[in-house]
């Protein structure tokens, strides 16, 4: 399975053509702190229309001899700094976007919730002392609540629960906890630090829990040195780490900074020689992020392994 992170906020919908041409199996709508209530409503309405149209798709598929294709639509639910009541409300709202798909044994669209802690600045300032004492809710809380709500019928039983993992910083115990809490698919951060990430993937693949889940390795579309540095910061790793310096040295040189072809090849090589070589990987999660990255996506993915 290959999924793609969709653009949201005032960029919502601007990636429709690129998404359609690249033949992704799933689309992930992030829950970002910069996306206010109005923009979040726009995302929800878009998803609602998408899944409601699935009924028409199924009717057409039923009359066709061609096998029906299934797309996974994933709505992210981030705890950020919300209290338990508001987090539960988000789970309920997001989960019920997929109500019209339930029950359906052969949907052309499946729904999933990606359960994450969130990364806004206010949360980051509290996380050094995170836990029950300061009341911050995390991805395990969301997974646990969503699982129970699904069991009680408060959200559709067909909704899958997804989680995230960072192979450069997370413990294997974190993976186990999330699987035990109900996660059945993981999206990882890019394995920029190859050996550190390889160790995490190999250890995870050897666990009993890995038998029950899909692991989609994160693939960015790097467009410049500055863009790579943004990603390293996002992944919570030091710019001065030996692995970070090694990775930066592999980028196209300054003379090629605006050479699109050189960056297309860099990204394709990262997929072939790093991301897709990790143990236990069952697919990829592509994250274009920028307009330039989006433009590269179709060409990079054309020859990428699936």
Q: In which residue ranges do the predicted regions lie?
A:
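Active-site pocket-lining/capping segments in soluble small-molecule metabolic enzymes
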Residues: 1-21, 114-156, 160-168, 207-276, ...
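Catalytic beta/alpha-barrel core
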Residues: 5, 26-38, 75-78, 113-117, ...
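Catalytic domains of carbohydrate-active enzymes, especially glycoside hydrolases
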Residues: 15-33, 178-181
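Non-catalytic positions within long, well-ordered alpha-helices that form the structural scaffold/packing
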Residues: 20, 92-108, 179-180, 277
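Short, well-ordered coil/turn segments that N-cap beta-strands
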Residues: 23-26, 67-73, 109-111, 155-161, ...
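Active-site-adjacent beta->alpha loops and helix N-cap segments on the catalytic face
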Residues: 35-50, 81-87, 120-148, 170-172, ...
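Catalytic cores of alpha/beta
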Residues: 83-97, 170-177, 225-231, 292-299
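Aromatic-anchored, glycine/proline-accented short structural segments
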Residues: 173-229
């Amino acid at each position: 399975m290959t999924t793609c992170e969709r653009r949201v906020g005032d960029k919502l919908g601007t990636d429709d053509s690129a998404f359609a041409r690249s033949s992704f199996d799933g689309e992930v709508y992030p829950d970002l702190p910069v996306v206010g209530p109005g923009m979040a409503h726009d995302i929800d309405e878009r998803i609602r229309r998408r899944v409601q149209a699935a009924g028409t798709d199924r009717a057409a598929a039923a009359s066709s001899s061609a096998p029906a294709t299934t797309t996974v639509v994933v709505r992210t639910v981030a705890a950020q700094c919300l209290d338990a009541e508001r987090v539960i409300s988000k789970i309920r709202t997001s989960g019920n976007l997929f109500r019209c798909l339930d029950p359906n044994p052969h949907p052309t669209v499946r729904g999933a919730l990606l359960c994450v802690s969130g990364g806004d600045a206010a949360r980051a300032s509290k996380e050094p002392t995170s836990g029950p004492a300061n009341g911050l809710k995390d991805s395990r809380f969301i997974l646990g609540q969503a699982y129970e709500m699904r069991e009680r019928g408060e959200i559709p039983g067909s909704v899958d629960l997804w989680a995230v993992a960072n192979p450069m910083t997370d413990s294997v115990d974190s993976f186990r906890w999330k699987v035990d809490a109900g996660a059945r698919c993981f999206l990882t951060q890019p394995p920029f630090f190859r050996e550190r990430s390889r160790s995490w993937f190999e250890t995870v693949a050897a666990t009993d829990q890995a038998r029950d889940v899909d692991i989609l390795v994160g693939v960015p579309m790097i467009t410049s040195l500055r863009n790579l540095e943004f990603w390293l910061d996002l992944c919570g790793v030091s710019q001065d780490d030996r692995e970070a310096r090694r990775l930066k040295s592999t980028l196209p040189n300054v003379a090629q900074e605006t050479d699109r072809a050189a960056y297309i090849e860099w990204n394709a090589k990262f997929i072939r020689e790093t991301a897709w070589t990790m143990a236990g990987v069952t697919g990829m999660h592509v994250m274009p992020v920028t307009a330039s990255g989006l433009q590269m996506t179709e060409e990079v993915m054309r020859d990428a392994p699936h």
